[in-house]
């Protein structure tokens, strides 16, 4: 009976040790994956920032063009109006 208890204890102990090793490896793998995802997110965020800056720049150009059109177009139309 003592032999059976020792064998059972040994099996349980080795099983728990192997499970803890597997859990460690799984945790390390998850940490590596999270780190990789964060790096990819940063790269995408940098690309997104560039696109956002381009959109802001385009918006500024459109505003300037609109302001110029408001001031220049009346001048041009007055210049080409037939004088009476």
UniProtKB/Swiss-Prot annotation:
Tissue expression notes: Expressed by the skin glands.
Signal peptide segment: 1-22
Compartmental location: Secreted
Keyword match Zinc-finger: no
Propeptide residue span(s): 23-54
Pfam families hit by this protein: FSAP_sig_propep
Keywords: Amphibian defense peptide, Antibiotic, Antimicrobial, Antiviral protein, Cleavage on pair of basic residues, Cytolysis, Hemolysis, Immunity, Innate immunity, Secreted, Signal
Listed Basic and acidic residues bias regions: 23-39
GO cellular component, one term: extracellular region
Acidic residues bias spans: 40-49
Region of interest (Disordered), residue spans: 23-53
Keyword Membrane attached: no
Gene Ontology biological-process annotations: defense response to Gram-negative bacterium; defense response to Gram-positive bacterium; defense response to protozoan; defense response to virus; hemolysis in another organism; innate immune response; regulation of defense response to virus
Principal subcellular localization: secreted
Family recorded in the similarity comment: Belongs to the frog skin active peptide (FSAP) family.
Entry function: Antimicrobial peptide that displays antibacterial, antiprotozoal, and antiviral activity. Exhibits antibacterial activity against the Gram-positive bacteria S.epidermidis ATCC 12228 (MIC=4 uM), E.casseliflavus ATCC 700327 (MIC=4 uM), S.aureus ATCC 25923 (MIC=8 uM) and E.faecalis ATCC 29212 (MIC=8 uM), and the Gram-negative bacteria E.coli ATCC 25922 (MIC=8 uM), K.pneumoniae ATCC 13883 (MIC=8 uM), the multi-resistant clinical isolate strain K.pneumoniae carbapanemase (KPC) MR (MIC=16 uM), and P.aeruginosa ATCC 27853 (MIC=32 uM).
The protein's name: Figainin 2
């Amino acid at each position: 009976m003592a032999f059976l208890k020792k064998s059972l204890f040994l099996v349980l102990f080795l099983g728990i040790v192997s499970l803890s090793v597997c859990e460690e490896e799984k945790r390390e793998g998850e940490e590596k994956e999270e780190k990789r995802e964060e790096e990819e997110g940063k790269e995408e965020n940098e690309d997104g920032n560039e696109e956002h800056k381009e959109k802001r720049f385009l918006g500024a150009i459109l505003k300037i063009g609109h302001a110029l059109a408001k001031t220049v177009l009346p001048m041009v139309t007055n210049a080409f109006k037939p004088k009476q």
